[in-house]
C-alpha cells in the first residue's frame, strides 16, 4: 500500500505544477471576421460535392464487370476443351480391356467347375454360353448367378425327392421337420448326419438364419429346463403339451410327404414372441417370491421353536437348581408355591401342612424358593406346638391386621423385627387373596420363646397349626 500511496502523491504534485496559473495576465490578440454571404450558399456547395462524389462510384462497377467478362472469355476456351478431350478416351479403353480380360478368366473358371460338378450337362450348351459371355459380359453374369441356379435347384427338388420318398422308410421322411420342432440336441445331430448322406436334399432344404436362431433358442431353453430354475418354468410349460406337439407334427409331416415335398414352416423364435416371454418371466418372479416367503416363514418357525426349546431348557435347569436348594435349605412349613395354591391346600381338608408343602414346591414358578428364602424364612429345628389354651388368650381380631398395630407385637419380642416383617407380608398376601378376616394365620419363627406358637382364631375350625 505504501508504494501505491507514494505514486499517487507524486502524480498529484506533477499535475498541480502543470495547472498552476500564471500570476500576470496574458493578452492574446483575437481577430473577428464577419461573413457577409448568407448561410444558404453553404448547403448548395455541400450538395454539389456529394454529386461529384457519387459519379466515380457509379463508374467503378462498370469497369469491374467489363474486367470480369474479359477474364471469363479468356478462361473458358482454354480450360474446357482440355478436360473433355484428353482423359475420357484413355480411361474407357483401359477399363474395357481390363474388364474383358477379367470377365473371360472368371467365366472360364466357372464353366470348368460346372462341367466337373454336372457331368450330365451338355457340352454344346456350355460352348454357346461361353460365346455369348464374350460378347455380352454383364448380361451373362446375371444369367449365371440367377437362372441357372434356380433351374438346378428345381431339378434337384423334383427328381431325388420322389426317389427318396419311395426308397427310404417312413421314419427317415420325418427327419427334416423334426429339426425345428424337437428341442433336443441329440435329435438335431441325428438329422444332420442323415442329411450328410444325401447332400442334394440338404441343398434343397438348407436352414435359413431364422431357423438357426430357433435351434439355438431351443438349446438354451433345454439348458434352462435342466437347471434348478427349470423346476419353476416347468410348472407353466407342462410336458404333456410339449410331448403332444411332436406327434401332431409327425402327422402333418406324413400328410405333406404324401401330397408333395413341401418345405417345413419356420418356427417363431423365443425373442420374437415377447408376450410369452413376459408372461413366463412374471410367473417365474411370482414363484420365486412365493418360495422366498415360504422359506422365510419356515425359518421364522424354526427360530421360534429353537427359542422355545431354549426357554424350556433354561426353565428346567432353573427349576432343578431351585428345587435342590429348597430341599437342602428351606425346612419351614411355608410352601414356595403361589398363594392361591397354598390357600387351596390349607383349606381343602389337608390337616398336615408338611404333606401339602412338597407338591407346592413343584409349582410353575422356579424362583419362588429363592424369594421365600430371602423373604425371612429360616431353618427351624424345634417342632412347632399348637396348644389350644393359648388360642383362647388371644383377643379376637375383628378387622384386618395392620403393620402399625401392637396385637402381633405382644407375642413377638422387639429383637425379632425381621420375623415380624415377614409375618406382615404374609398377612398382606392373604388380604390380596381375599381371605376373610376371621381366618388369619400368624407365624412366629422364633423357637426359643415360650410364646412360639401359631395362634389361630377360634372361629377357623380348619386352620392348620404350624
Swiss-Prot record:
Sequence segments annotated as region (16 X repeats): 48-157
Entry's localization field: Secreted
Sequence repeat copies, ranges: 48-50, 53-55, 58-60, 70-72, 74-76, 78-80, 82-84, 90-92, 94-96, 98-100, 102-104, 106-108, 125-127, 139-141, 148-150, 155-157
Signal listed as a keyword: yes
Region (Disordered): 55-94, 119-220, 378-435
Keywords, alphabetical: Glycoprotein, Repeat, Secreted, Signal
Glycosylation site residues: 294, 352
GO biological process, one term: imaginal disc eversion
Keyword Repeat: yes
Signal peptide segment: 1-16
Domain of life of the source: Eukaryota
Basic and acidic residues composition-biased segments: 124-160
Domain comment as written in the entry: The regions 203-253, 256-333 and 335-377 are thought to contain either alpha helical or beta pleated sheet motifs.
Name this protein carries in UniProt: 20-hydroxyecdysone protein
Organism from which the protein derives: Drosophila melanogaster (Fruit fly)
Gene: ImpE2
Amino acid at each position: 500500500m505504501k508504494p501505491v500511496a507514494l505514486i499517487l502523491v507524486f502524480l498529484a504534485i506533477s499535475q498541480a505544477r502543470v495547472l498552476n496559473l500564471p500570476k500576470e495576465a496574458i493578452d492574446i490578440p483575437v481577430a473577428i471576421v464577419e461573413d457577409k454571404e448568407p448561410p444558404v450558399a453553404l448547403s448548395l456547395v455541400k450538395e454539389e460535392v456529394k454529386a461529384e462524389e457519387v459519379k466515380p462510384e457509379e463508374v467503378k462497377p462498370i469497369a469491374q464487370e467489363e474486367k470480369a467478362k474479359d477474364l471469363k472469355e479468356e478462361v473458358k476456351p482454354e480450360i474446357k476443351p482440355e478436360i473433355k478431350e484428353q482423359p475420357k478416351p484413355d480411361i474407357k479403353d483401359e477399363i474395357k480391356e481390363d474388364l474383358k480380360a477379367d470377365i473371360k478368366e472368371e467365366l472360364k473358371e466357372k464353366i470348368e467347375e460346372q462341367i466337373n460338378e454336372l457331368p450330365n450337362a451338355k457340352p454344346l450348351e456350355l460352348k454357346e454360353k461361353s460365346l455369348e459371355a464374350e460378347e455380352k459380359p454383364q448380361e451373362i453374369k446375371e444369367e449365371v448367378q440367377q437362372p441357372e441356379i434356380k433351374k438346378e435347384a428345381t431339378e434337384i427338388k423334383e427328381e431325388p425327392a420322389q426317389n427318396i420318398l419311395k426308397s427310404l422308410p417312413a421314419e427317415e421322411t420325418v427327419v427334416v421337420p423334426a429339426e425345428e420342432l424337437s428341442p433336443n440336441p441329440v435329435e438335431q445331430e441325428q438329422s444332420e448326419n442323415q442329411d450328410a448322406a444325401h447332400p442334394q436334399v440338404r441343398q434343397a432344404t438348407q436352414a435359413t438364419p431364422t431357423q438357426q436362431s430357433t435351434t439355438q433358442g431351443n438349446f438354451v431353453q433345454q439348458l434352462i429346463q435342466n437347471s434348478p430354475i427349470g423346476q419353476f418354468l416347468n410348472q407353466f410349460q407342462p410336458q404333456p403339451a410339449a410331448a403332444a406337439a411332436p406327434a401332431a407334427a409327425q402327422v402333418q409331416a406324413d400328410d405333406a410327404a404324401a401330397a408333395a415335398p413341401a418345405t417345413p414352416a419356420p418356427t417363431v423364435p423365443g425373442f420374437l414372441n415377447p408376450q410369452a416371454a413376459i408372461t413366463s418371466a412374471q410367473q417365474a418372479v411370482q414363484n420365486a417370491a412365493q418360495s422366498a416367503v415360504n422359506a422365510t416363514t419356515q425359518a421364522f418357525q424354526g427360530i421360534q421353536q429353537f427359542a422355545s426349546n431354549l426357554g424350556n431348557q433354561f426353565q428346567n435347569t432353573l427349576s432343578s437348581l431351585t428345587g435342590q436348594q429348597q430341599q437342602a435349605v428351606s425346612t419351614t412349613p411355608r410352601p414356595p408355591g403361589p398363594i392361591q395354591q397354598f390357600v387351596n391346600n390349607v383349606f381343602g381338608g389337608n390337616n398336615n401342612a408338611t404333606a401339602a408343602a412338597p407338591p407346592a414346591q413343584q409349582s410353575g414358578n422356579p424362583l419362588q424358593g429363592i424369594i421365600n428364602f430371602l423373604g425371612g424364612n429360616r431353618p427351624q429345628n424345634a417342632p412347632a406346638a399348637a396348644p389350644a389354651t393359648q388360642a383362647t388368650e388371644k383377643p379376637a381380631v375383628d378387622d384386618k391386621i395392620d403393620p402399625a398395630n401392637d396385637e402381633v407385637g405382644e407375642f413377638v419380642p422387639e429383637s425379632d423385627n425381621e420375623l415380624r416383617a415377614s409375618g406382615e407380608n404374609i398377612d398382606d398376601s392373604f388380604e390380596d387373596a381375599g381371605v376373610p378376616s376371621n381366618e388369619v394365620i400368624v407365624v412366629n419363627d422364633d423357637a426359643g420363646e415360650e410364646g412360639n406358637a401359631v395362634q389361630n382364631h377360634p372361629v377357623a375350625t380348619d386352620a392348620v397349626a404350624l
